Amino acid sequence: VYKRQLADYRGKVIFLNFWATWCGPCREELSRVQKDIIDRFKGNEDFVFLPVSRGETRETVAAFREKMGYTFPMGLDPEQKIYRLYASNYIPRNFLIGKDGKVISATIGYEAPEFDELILLIERQLNSAN
């Protein structure tokens, strides 16, 4: 469970991702996250990736993370309280939030070209002077 709020990350580019272990498109998307997001932006203190598992237990998420070999932390939202602040249906659900705290992009589902565009948006935000 994340113990911080989005406001704690003001001034940073935030990639907020809602997912679940049973969701095929979520799993496909997460398979790209390590290489295309975590490794690519590693060490950039202006970037934060917040993956939030929707409706699952700590044990389920921990077992999935270990099985897949992911090194990034995964937040928990077992009762979907956080998710309901952003959406009512469908995962994966992604929000790219700019340094000013405003949503730049919101996507539903996983499609490779859309994910590629998200990576470019992250790069542009990190390279901007704001």
Residues covered by each model-derived region:
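Thiol-/selenol-based redox modules, centered on thioredoxin-like
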Residues: L96-N130
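Extracytoplasmic/secreted envelope proteins and their assembly/folding machinery
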Residues: L6, L30, Q34, I38, ...
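Short active-site neighborhood of thiol/selenol oxidoreductases, capturing the structured segment around
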Residues: L6-R27
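Short, small-residue-biased leader/transition segments that mark boundaries at the very start
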Residues: V1-Y2
